[in-house]
Amino acid sequence: MEREQDTPWTQSTEHTNIQKEENGQQTQKLERPNSTQSMDHYLKIMNQVDMHKQTAFWKQWLSLKNPTQESLKTRVLKRWKLFNKQGWTS
């Protein structure tokens, strides 16, 4: 059976299991995580990405100087539309 090509995703989720044989030699066995571990890893990464997006949004919000109510409304609507669009496509 052919081994799939390594990608950053598979490299980051692979684990090497080193075992000592009876004669003292060490053997390495590459273990791929099961689907539950892979999904947990994926969800953890995506949660970190989402938190980063939210943090960046609020930093921009707090950096506004003397905004008017209308400029805030316009800015919030633009950012909200952009955020939702990116959230569904990525």
From Swiss-Prot:
Q: Where is this region: Disordered?
A: 1-39
* Pfam families in alphabetical order: PB1-F2
What's this protein's family per the entry? Belongs to the influenza viruses PB1-F2 family.
Additional comment? Is not encoded in all strains, and seems to be dispensable for replication.
* Compositionally biased intervals (Polar residues): 7-16, 24-39
Q: Where in the cell is it found?
A: Host mitochondrion inner membrane; Host nucleus; Host cytoplasm, Host cytosol
Ranges annotated as spanning the membrane: none
Q: Per the record, which residues fall in region Mitochondrial targeting sequence?
A: 65-87
State if Nuclease is listed as a keyword: no
User: Where is the site Low pathogenicity?
Assistant: N66
Q: Which organism is it from?
A: Influenza A virus (strain A/Chicken/Pennsylvania/1370/1983 H5N2)
- Relate the assembly described in the record: Oligomer. Interacts with human SLC25A6/ANT3 and VDAC1. Interacts with host MAVS.
Q: What is this protein called?
A: Protein PB1-F2
Give UniProt keywords alphabetically: Apoptosis, Host cytoplasm, Host membrane, Host mitochondrion, Host mitochondrion inner membrane, Host nucleus, Host-virus interaction, Inhibition of host innate immune response by virus, Inhibition of host MAVS by virus, Inhibition of host RLR pathway by virus, Membrane, Modulation of host cell apoptosis by virus, Viral immunoevasion
Q: List the GO cellular component terms.
A: host cell cytosol; host cell mitochondrial inner membrane; host cell nucleus; membrane
Q: Which gene encodes it?
A: PB1
Role description: Plays an important role in promoting lung pathology in both primary viral infection and secondary bacterial infection. Promotes alteration of mitochondrial morphology, dissipation of mitochondrial membrane potential, and cell death. Alternatively, inhibits the production of interferon in the infected cell at the level of host mitochondrial antiviral signaling MAVS. Its level of expression differs greatly depending on which cell type is infected, in a manner that is independent of the levels of expression of other viral proteins. Monocytic cells are more affected than epithelial cells.
The alphabetized list of GO BP terms reads: symbiont-mediated perturbation of host apoptosis; symbiont-mediated suppression of host cytoplasmic pattern recognition receptor signaling pathway via inhibition of MAVS activity
Q: Which InterPro entries match?
A: Flu_proapoptotic_PB1-F2 (IPR021045)
